[in-house]
Amino acid sequence: MSSNQAEGLIIAAHGRHYTVELADGSLRQCFPRGKKNGPAVGDRVRITPQGRDEGAIEAVLPRRNLLFRSDEMRVKQFAANVDQLLIVVAVEPTFADDLTGRSLAGAWSADIEPVIVLNKIDLPNGLDAARARLEPLRRLGVPVIELSAQDHAMVHERLAPRLAGRTSLLLGQSGMGKSTLLNTLVPHAQAATREYSAALDMGRHTTTSTRLYHLPEPGGDLIDSPGFQAFGLQHLNGEQILRGFPEFAPHIEHCRFYNCTHRHEPGCGVLAALQAGQIDAGRYALYLRILDENAAARPY
């Protein structure tokens, strides 16, 4: 690294420009050189400072992982160097099982640990139904943390210890209470957003961008992303899709054919496990939907 360069952490992304936090806590609005794939929130980068508060991103430092989601048109980077994915669902309104399952598959395919946060447990009428819908995921070993985001003591008792010293990405459909949870965990979140906006003259764009916040004691980082209603996985190949369904793994070794797709082949260990009730039918149906979508998708 040359003497006029510095290393920093990307704490926000707004299209093709990024907010980079340097070691001294100062912020710079930076732009990547060239048109290759850009960095993501959570990336550590090397920049060349320019002017009072700008800079050019020269390189992205090696990352542990990178989480994507995609649609028919393009692949979108979520965040890099993530330790765990917090998927926020709620007792009310009804959450989408399909979206939850896709988020889990995206996390597992990127070697990121998923955690489900069941919010609004103070609404008892739908609690049993929500628990029942999450039970197949509990059986897979996915941690489910139940809380009410409006109960600060409960959040700090049940969730905060899991965040300490880790980088967590917060995802959730609109209406699940993700913003309330963020403001409970990071009391200065709204103030920080206004500060970044003023310092970098970002205006309204900051409200819809992915952003990293530093958690108060006992520490850790929390990445918040805008509410989403779709989580496409068209960027995954067949092997990566299977990593998103770890419960298939013990049965794949019993497949008769090495290139089995687990859809219709004779002697398929996964289909046998499905028929025996060892694989959840809803999860298997999601696997088929993802395969069909990816087969129909246009290449990027």
UniProtKB/Swiss-Prot annotation:
Entry protein name: Small ribosomal subunit biogenesis GTPase RsgA
Source species: Bordetella pertussis (strain Tohama I / ATCC BAA-589 / NCTC 13251)
Keyword hit for Ribonucleoprotein: no
GO cellular component: cytoplasm
A Gene Ontology molecular function term of the record: metal ion binding
Phylogenetic classification of the source organism: Bacteria, Pseudomonadati, Pseudomonadota, Betaproteobacteria, Burkholderiales
SUPFAM superfamilies xrefs: Nucleic acid-binding proteins (SSF50249), P-loop containing nucleoside triphosphate hydrolases (SSF52540)
Keyword GTP-binding in annotation: yes
Cellular localisation: Cytoplasm
EC primary class: hydrolase
Binding site for Zn(2+): 255, 260, 262, 268
Needed cofactors: Zn(2+)
